[in-house]
Amino acid sequence: MTQRVRTRFAPSPTGFIHLGNIRSALYPWAFARRMKGDFILRIEDTDVERSSQEAVDVILESMAWLEMDIDEGPFYQMQRMDRYREVVAQMVESGLAYRCYMSTEELDALREAQRERGEKPRYNGFWRPEPGKVLPEPPAGVDPVIRFKNPIGGSVVWDDAVKGRIEISNDELDDLVIARPDGTPTYNFCVVVDDLDMKITHVIRGDDHVNNTPRQINIIRALGGTPPVYAHLPTVLNEQGEKMSKRHGAMAVTGYRDEGYLPEAVLNYLARLGWAHGDAEIFSREQFVEWFDLEHLGKSPAQYNPEKLAWLNNHYIKVGDNQRLATLTQPFIEALGGKVEGADLAGVVALVKDRANTLKEVAQAALLFYRGEPQADAALKAEHLTPEIQPALAALANQLAALPEWKREAISATFKAVLAEFGLKMPKLAMPVRLLVAGQLQTPGIDAVLELFGRDTVLRRLAAAA
């Protein structure tokens, strides 16, 4: 019987979560969904001083925005301390781990001497019990660390789904501290216990964890478990080619939402930031899940390209449902001081969205419909609202008032009739109408703009020219 796939995302809540971080959630989420398995969220909050509930909330908010649903969790490592201590005690009792009384000063001196000899700094196994070895009496008043008895000789070998076969000699690994003098377990140990208890089958994470993997595999095997499949993802680089980080200017995932990016655009972009399905650039969430596999994960670092993300966001705005976009755009309009009333916002969005890369830009383009009475520049009025144009404006207003239906086509036909009657070119009439109705010279098509403003508003504002 095939084992059910179980993946996990295990962030540390020590800062905001950026695109590079959330990609490490997207791929295990997609793999679990593709394989009809389970996706678990685990919060690795053992760094008590740096961890915060605010950071946890941002992680949950970011995942919810991208619709990365979880099947189990969130589990918090700080709430599992009793379990970790239980396993540490079992390992000491069974001889898999031991108490080490070497002080920090002694360890520092040992490492310095090793460096001077050109050796790799490492613990020398002084307190490691072996058959026939006589250990000194533990020093009084010293709380020991607990070290894992790493295998001597041989190698740790695993077939990484991204990096291929990796082999590390056990001689390169010293006996890892799994519990500190105060009894608190260490990171690598907690990860192993969690992965075993949660029956994780695939660990898809950043390649900054590669060096932890041989240590974790040895502990897993010592505890009688089977190591999961590992897939270590190459780093995500920023525009300057540096590792993406807050220090180097990375923006929080929620920042993209607040700037007016759509979740489907960000998800589509993230999916391609280290994985490919042929030449497919644009695909839905459902297609991504259907296509996702570990075999096509990239082996080289992926570089963030804001222009590509903006292009994708523009695509999703252009093809997006106008009513949904209107709902998402309204807060941006209100943030600009607009009051959404009168013109149908879904219709306005449909009119202005094609050139917008973000919902903020949609809102800026839509604002002319929602900022109250137009305040056109006096110089522009003097230039365009000349005595010569007044008869044509009056005729236009009269004919618009008589329209049986306030539709774009009828408005356009009315303009053409007035232009023909007075022998005018479109700009000569459209410019003053734009100033009077919208308060600016640049707008989308005048017939569409007037239709959205509505008959009453248009006629009232045109009357101001009289």
Curated annotation (Swiss-Prot):
Keyword Transferase among UniProt keywords = no
The cellular location(s) given in this protein's UniProt record come to: Cytoplasm
Query: What GO molecular function annotations does the UniProt record carry, in alphabetical order?
Result: ATP binding; glutamate-tRNA ligase activity; tRNA binding; zinc ion binding
Pfam families per record: Anticodon_2, tRNA-synt_1c
Motif mapping: 'KMSKS' region: 243-247
Q: Which residues bind ATP?
A: K246
Look up the EC number in the record and give it: 6.1.1.17
Keyword terms, alphabetized? Aminoacyl-tRNA synthetase, ATP-binding, Cytoplasm, Ligase, Nucleotide-binding, Protein biosynthesis
InterPro entries, per database record = aa-tRNA-synth_I_cd-bd, aa-tRNA-synth_I_codon-bd_sub2, aa-tRNA-synth_I_CS, aa_tRNA-synth_I_cd-bd_sf, Glu-tRNA-ligase_bac/mito, Glu/Gln-tRNA-synth, Glu/Gln-tRNA-synth_Ib_cat-dom, GluQ/Sye
Top-rank EC class of the record's enzyme: ligase
- Motif 'HIGH' region extends across 11-21
* HAMAP family (UniProt xref): Glu_tRNA_synth_type1
Function comment: Catalyzes the attachment of glutamate to tRNA(Glu) in a two-step reaction: glutamate is first activated by ATP to form Glu-AMP and then transferred to the acceptor end of tRNA(Glu).
Q: Which family does it belong to?
A: Belongs to the class-I aminoacyl-tRNA synthetase family. Glutamate--tRNA ligase type 1 subfamily.
The UniProt subunit note reads as follows: Monomer.
Would you tell me the protein name for this molecule? Glutamate--tRNA ligase
The scientific name of the source species is Cupriavidus necator (strain ATCC 17699 / DSM 428 / KCTC 22496 / NCIMB 10442 / H16 / Stanier 337) (Ralstonia eutropha)
Which lineage do the record's taxonomy fields give for this organism? Answer: Bacteria, Pseudomonadati, Pseudomonadota, Betaproteobacteria, Burkholderiales
| Gene behind this protein | gltX
